[in-house]
Every structure is written in structure tokens, then in C-alpha cells.
Amino acid sequence: MTVQDYLLKFRKISSLESLEKLYDHLNYTLTDDQELINMYRAADHRRAELVSGGRLFDLGQVPKSVWHYVQ
């Protein structure tokens, strides 16, 4: 799957807690390194969207000021 595919999957989730559960599940089940990298990028992107109040951003377009709040 691509980063965009994972991001669309993660956008169905509206809470950080649920996102972390899905992230943990995928982290243990995926074996391909490129798949893991794509999933990590999408999960981080979705975390940024959630901490910004639910605003949606294009991939690579999250403002630097938002990343400060992502844990």
C-alpha cells in the first residue's frame, strides 16, 4: 500500500487512542520495510491532523508549527 492508502485508512479514525491501536497492530503484522515506512509516514501525518483540531492536510503539507504538538 502507498502512504496515501494508509492515510485514507487512518482518516477513518477520529481519536488518537484508536489510531495508536491500529498503528500497533499494523506495526506487528507488516513485514516489508517499505510498507512499514509508508505506514509510519501516514500515521505521523494523521497524528498531526488530529492534534490540529481535525484539519486535513495534503501529504507533505503539514505546517511546522503543528509538528510541535505531535508526540
Curated annotation (Swiss-Prot):
The entry's keywords: DNA-binding, Transcription, Transcription regulation
BP-aspect Gene Ontology terms: bacterial nucleoid packaging; negative regulation of DNA-templated transcription; negative regulation of single-species biofilm formation on inanimate substrate; positive regulation of termination of DNA-templated transcription
Site (Interacts with H-NS): 44
Any Pfam family the entry gives: HHA
GO CC terms in record: bacterial nucleoid; H-NS-Cnu complex
Phenotype of gene-disrupted mutants: At 0.3 M NaCl up-regulation of 1 gene and down-regulation of 6 genes was observed; a double cnu-hha deletion up-regulated 134 and down-regulated 5 genes, most of which are thought to have been acquired horizontally and are also up-regulated in double hns-stpA deletions.
GO MF terms held by the record: DNA binding
Protein function: Modifies the set of genes regulated by H-NS; Hha and Cnu (YdgT) increase the number of genes bound by H-NS/StpA and may also modulate the oligomerization of the H-NS/StpA-complex on DNA. The complex formed with H-NS binds to the specific 26-bp cnb site in the origin of replication oriC. Can complement, at least partially, the absence of the Hha protein in hha mutants.
Subunit organization: Forms complexes with both H-NS and StpA.
Protein family per UniProt: Belongs to the Hha/YmoA/Cnu family.
Other information: Expression becomes maximal as cells enter the stationary phase but decreases later in the stationary phase.
Protein name per UniProt: OriC-binding nucleoid-associated protein
Organism of derivation: Escherichia coli (strain K12)
Chain's gene name: cnu
